[in-house]
Amino acid sequence: MNSWWGRLMMKRLCRLVWLLPLTAVLLFTLVSLAPIDPVQAYVGARMSMIGPEQQAAIEAAWGLDQPGWIRFFHWLAHLVQGDLGDSISYNAPVLTVLVERFPASLALMGCSFLAAFVVGSGLGVLAAACQGRWPDRLIRGWAMVISVSPGFWIALLFISIFAVQLAWLPSCCALPPGVTQDEAHWWQYGRHLVLPVLTLSIYGTGPLILHVRQRLIGFLDGPSARHLRLHGMSSTRLALGPGSRHALGSAVTVHLASIGELFGGSVLAETIFAWPGLGQATVKAATGADAPLLLGIALVTVVVVLLGNLLADILAAWVDPRLRIMPQEETLPRLKRLPWLKASARLKTASRLKVEPKS
Amino acid sequence: MKTQQMMSLQVEALTLTMKGHSQPLVGPLSWRLEAGQCMGLVGGSGAGKSLVADALFQALPAEIECQGRMTLNDAPLSPLSMALMPQSIEALDPLAPVTQQIRRFARRNAEAVDPTRLLAQVQLEAEAGALFPHQLSGGMARRVLLALTLATGADWLVIDEPTLGLDPTVADQLIQLLSTLKAQGKGVLLISHDLVRLIQVADEVMILASGQQVETAPVAAFDGSGGGLKHPFSRALWQAQQWTQNPLTIHQGDER
Amino acid sequence: MKRVMVSIVSIVTRSDDTGKSYRLALFMAIVVTLMIWGGGALPDTMMAVNPAQRSLAPSWQHWLGTDLLGRDMASRTLAGLAQSLKVGLLAAALSTLLAMVMGMMAALNRSLDRLVSSLTDMMLGMPHFVLLIMVAYAFGGGTVGVTWAVALTHWPRLARLLRHEAKTLVKSDYVQVSRSLGRSNLWLARHHLMPHLMPQWIAGFVVIFPHAILHEAGLSFIGLGIEPHLPSIGVMLANSLNAMLAGFWWVVLAPGLGLMLVAFGFERLGERLRRQALPPDRGSSGVSPGQVA
């Protein structure tokens, strides 16, 4: 644990020790607060067919008659054993649902993540290189507009243009109707992936473009770039060489830290495109009062986002050595409020109060 | 004698003017710097010393116009035949280790550059090559900046305020380093307001008063009360520096 | 009254950057007021179901066309925007208020400070939209649910910023003197902290607002937000899917464009205010500078 990333990992692990339990408590509390009767959600329309005794029996069987904190520890104990409970809406263990749906989400989010990074940082570099001229204005305006456009609206527009008017691409699902996973060709899969990835990645480029542009301009206008330019380095070389470390290094960090946003976008995108991933399951769980599934998904995404942030921190310190934690670096002891300051202040103010006549 | 004649950086009537103004900011300045010599450039704050360096490198702000003739061995002066050591250590790239920065500047050099040897030349350990700028002390950072100018292989160095913010011992060492470079045949234009250290290395000193070149004096003139200096401003500048020197050395012990 | 008018006019007509911000702010305030008032005052007949005029393309009579039930899209968009703006305003106000309280509490009390920073860290560590869904779910969805969801999830960044500002204020001499004179924390917060934090607070509100309405629309879109029978942008877009697949593109274009334009205006205003009132925030997790919401 002598290297800087070892110290970083230790620091982050210590954080996780209190962060994860606190998060689990918060999530569980939120789900338990919901004014939805789980029994009713489970039984659904047949509620009228069961009497109050049967209802109480089901509640007892699920442990719903117990106080909240007992239910929490019950849930936690099962969680530690890898049991996340049963999903009501999919009629299967939550873990199975998660494992089944994770690959589709991973494909969608992974492709979007990469596409957004390539396009976003490319446009950002271009904008910085043309600072103040029309390509820069165009790209900046574009970034601004998409960062305030509702992502799901962009998806609907794409469907309207590419799927309905032009009829180039499919608008629904991961595969053509009637084709099973085994029969499918990879290109069928790919064709269905295009529109969701386009939607999701466009949404992610907005902040990235602005960030890369800002960082690169900051470097190119800064003293060290000026110094290199004075000694004969060309602007292109400057932007692609030393500048890339300034711009892209932090771009990776920002992009990784925005994985949570990406997942949020995928919830909407998967709903619109009927993509069989975790996002679609989230909506189904939330609207179908499927508390165990909702909790499970929330936990998975929290872990993914934490990992993303950890990776972002490591990369940030790798790119910028000023962020590395050095062993000799000790936090200065916080200055205690000085008692004499208190006393003298009181004295001063008291004397002033005496002199000033009261009106 | 003829080679001496050939190797010189000559500036005639260098005048810097703010666009739309008739009064020049700096100049007209004229000087001639020979290889293996050091020309000092002094003046009060805001006299336009750093602008002169920018003018040599054709890197003036857009609103300043530059007139005059700058030649190197009678050919027009190219910025690429000189190297600048800037005033601020911000000029170091914060995200690159020293060795990598040396390589960036060495790209211009026709000869292969060994970073370790270069670091040794500015009296830095080879280990310093792996350090990032934020890990360097002020004196080390200045030496790295000097190493960067050497990496370019340029024969003409423009050194801007090398001792600013350094403590006296470190500043003296840096000046010592500059005289070694001078002895190796580099032509040095040394911009500083630290006249006392300047005359330890310079052969001639050019004095600016609010942008005007009032005098170019040989170092020998800076002696005693400055009787050898022609212009009253030069004398005042010299006396002021001497006056501050003495009380400072007396009081230094009492301060802490 | 006259003096107020005169000072407003003199501020708005300033030719510098600040004047530009004030003009934009005044313009956005007028737009929002008109929309909320206009959306509420629309006669019911404008939005009534009219089977004779189903799915008409935009024309002089129906500027933005009609939907599958023959309702005028322009009126519905306006009414939907009014609804979204109302929820957004309330949620953003609650959120910034929460941020203010949290920030001041953290600055004035050390143990509360620890609590607030852990809570902030935790909230920022969670995927934003999932948290929104969870809170909306906890409140059982609907207009109430979505308002609370947005209000309870958008405060952390602003709270972190206000906490930082308040902490430097608390360290200053005059606050320390007041404290040693026996003033209560409440008094300090009201007289020393709040007036100084006002600019950041207002800037924070404007920055949060567009996010609030966008997230409200997102939640309504997936069915966890505003009730389906009320006009709202999210619900309208969710219902437009079938009409759009049938080729009636105008049912999609109008509501989204309206929402985007309002959000765009506030984003621009927020950008200006942020530059003027908020210092660049350099978080440890590489959050882009100045990002508040």
For each feature predicted by the language model, list its residue ranges.
Chain A
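Alpha-helical transmembrane segments of integral membrane proteins
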Residues: 2-7, 20, 98-135, 151, ...
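N-terminal signal-anchor/signal peptide hydrophobic helix marking the start
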Residues: 10-16
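Hydrophobic alpha-helical transmembrane segments of membrane transport/permease proteins
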Residues: 20-70, 166-186
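Hydrophobic alpha-helical membrane-insertion segments
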Residues: 20-29, 145-162, 254-260
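Short hydrophobic, aromatic-rich alpha-helical segments embedded in or entering the lipid bilayer
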Residues: 49-81, 273-285
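Membrane-interfacial helix-loop-helix junctions in multi-pass membrane proteins
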Residues: 59-68, 85-90, 94, 176-193, ...
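Individual transmembrane alpha-helix segments
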Residues: 67-111
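Membrane-water interface segments at transmembrane-helix boundaries in multipass membrane proteins
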Residues: 141-206
